[in-house]
Amino acid sequence: MTQTLLAIENLSVGFRHQQTVRTVVNDVSLQIEAGETLALVGESGSGKSVTALSILRLLPSPPVEYLSGDIRFHGESLLHASDQTLRGVRGNKIAMIFQEPMVSLNPLHTLEKQLYEVLSLHRGMRREAARGEILNCLDRVGIRQAAKRLTDYPHQLSGGERQRVMIAMALLTRPELLIADEPTTALDVSVQAQILQLLRELQGELNMGMLFITHNLSIVRKLAHRVAVMQNGRCVEQNYAATLFASPTHPYTQKLLNSEPSGDPVPLPEPASTLLDVEQLQVAFPIRKGILKRIVDHNVVVKNISFTLRAGETLGLVGESGSGKSTTGLALLRLINSQGSIIFDGQPLQNLNRRQLLPIRHRIQVVFQDPNSSLNPRLNVLQIIEEGLRVHQPTLSAAQREQQVIAVMHEVGLDPETRHRYPAEFSGGQRQRIAIARALILKPSLIILDEPTSSLDKTVQAQILTLLKSLQQKHQLAYLFISHDLHVVRALCHQVIILRQGEVVEQGPCARVFATPQQEYTRQLLALS
C-alpha cells in the first residue's frame, strides 16, 4: 500500500495590497505518494510556483496570506507548524531546486564551501568525509573534472553547469520529497536526459516523492506518473500521465498539448547577400596559478569555427551547456577576446578598437536568455528601450525617442500604455518582448539570440517564435540563434551548427542535418529531443 507523503487540501493563497487581497491560488488539492512523481504544468502566472513555495512557507508574509486549506507532510500540517519544525523539514526532508541557479547560489563562495554547508548543517558531516560525497554527487550530475571545479565560483560555470550544482546540492541530503521548479529549463537535451535518469535512479533508491514543475511536456511524458494542469490559479485537470496525454478533457490542456514549436523558417530573400563571414574563430581563457597568478596554460573553449550568415537568414548554434555556444556569441559581439577573422558586412572587426566599433554596434544587437538579469529593474520600460537611442542617436529629443519607443512596442505586441511600468510588473514572455524591442529599436541587421525562449512556457514560446519570424520577414533581419531546443531550431533556422566541447561536429542546411544526420553525436541529440 502506497503512503501519502504530501497532501495539499483545498489550498487558497492571496497577495494583500492595502485593503484588497488578490487570490493567486484558488482551492487547489494535490497528493503525492512516496516514490511518485507529480508534474505541475501551466503557463507562467498560473500559480505553479506559488503552490510549490507554499509547501515550505517560503513566501513572504505579508503580503502573502493563506486564505484557506492546509498542506500536510506525513499527515502533519506545515502551514501551522512552528519555525523550529519547519527548519527540520526545509532542505532536509523536503528539498527544493529552483529555476534560476544564479539567484540561488552564493556568488562569493566556492562550490565546495556551498556544498559542504549542506552536509554540515543537515547531516553533521566533517569536511574530510564530506569531500568524497560532494565529488561523487557532482560526478553523478555530470560535472566534468569535479575535483578541479570545487574551487570554482558560480560565475565560472555555464548556465547548465550551475543548474547541475543546484541539483547536487538538493540531493546531498537524500530528501523524502523533492520539489523541482523548472530544474532542467537551462539544460540541453543530452544533459537533461542525464538529469532525468539521475532523478529516476535516486527516486528508486530513496523511495522519494517528487513535485516536478515544468512547461516542457516532453519531460512530463518521460518522468511523471500523474499530471496536474493549472490555469489562472486553479487546477483544471488532473490525471495519470498516459491518460491525460492520450485524451485530455479540458480545452486548456488541449491547447497546451498543441503548443509545441512547429512550422518552417521564413523564406530567404533572393538574392541574399553575405552579412557575416567568420573564419577559424577561436577563444581561449588563460589559466592562472600561484601567488602572482601567472598564466600557465590556456583553456580553449571555441576551436576554429567557420561559417557565413546571409541577410534574412537564421543560423542555429546547438550544443550542450559548456560547448561554447554563448562564448561564440560574445566573441562575435567583441565582448571577449578571440582569434580568427570576423567580417561584418565587408568590415573586418577583429582589429577595431572600442571607438571604431561604436558606429557598428547598433547594427549587431543581442537578446539574452533571462530578461530578469538583462533588464535593469530600476528603469521603467520606456527608459530601458530608449537607452540605445541615447547612445547611438544623441541628437533625438525626448519626445522623438518616446515616439520611437511607442512604435516599437506596438511592433513587438506590447501595449505602449505600459511603458512607464517596471520589469517586475510583467510576465516572463512580456519581459522577453521588452528585450526584443530594446534590440529592434536601433534597426539592427543582425540579432544574436542567446536562448531567448528557453525560460518561457510553450504557449508563450510559440508566440515569441511567431514574433521573431514576422520581424525577420519585415526587416530582413539575420539571426544567430543559440539554443538547446531542437524543436525550436527546426522551426526557425535555415542553417545549423552542432557544437561539442568547442568544436564543430556537424553543420549544414537545417532540413538536411535533421533528416539525415552524418555524425553519431547529432543522431543522439535528435533521438533525445
Swiss-Prot record:
ATP 2 binds at residues 319-326. Pfam families: ABC_tran (PF00005), oligo_HPY (PF08352). GO terms for cellular component: ATP-binding cassette (ABC) transporter complex, substrate-binding subunit-containing; membrane; plasma membrane. Disulfide bonds: none annotated. Transmembrane segments: none annotated. One of its GO terms (biological process) is oligopeptide transmembrane transport. Residues 6-257, 287-526 form the ABC transporter domain. SUPFAM superfamilies: P-loop containing nucleoside triphosphate hydrolases. One of its GO terms (molecular function) is ATPase-coupled transmembrane transporter activity. ATP 1 binds at residues 42-49. It comes from the Bacteria. Keywords: ATP-binding, Nucleotide-binding, Repeat, Transport. Belongs to the ABC transporter superfamily. This is Uncharacterized ABC transporter ATP-binding protein YejF. The gene is yejF.
